[in-house]
């Protein structure tokens, strides 16, 4: 099955998408209350709309990584002179070369071949916190066809990576949003 990337992730004027920005902001209260002056990695940033909102809320710098080149091009156009960089990268293979205050992965881990491997690699580069948005069924455990229906316990990954669950809230459509802070 091939994904149709002609549609955007975010619904925008003149470009249909699958999600509304306002819906995708649900459950991100902690992130926005704590982003000021922080560096942020947005893994799987789509068109960069949440990255843009983080920069507007005072993030020092936001680095986005997205698989779809058209989305990266649009994100770089939309960001203007905000402190945001966006690059093309496949989160199955891409690894951060530096540390960030906060790492976010919003609706990305369950789409990967090895969510636990990627979660551990990203957590290793987070100085203060990691925010995950996961499907509602069984979170923080992921079981998805894209990872061969194996169970991937993101909670255990975060615990062994030196984080504790600070809060878990519901996002749009009951998605699980977990905020992990460094112990």
Q: Which residues fall in each region the model found?
A:
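Short, conserved loop/helix-junction motifs that constitute active-site signature segments
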Residues: 122-126
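Short alpha-helix
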Residues: 146-161
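Conserved beta-strand signature within the Rossmann-like core of class I S-adenosyl-L-methionine
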Residues: 127-139
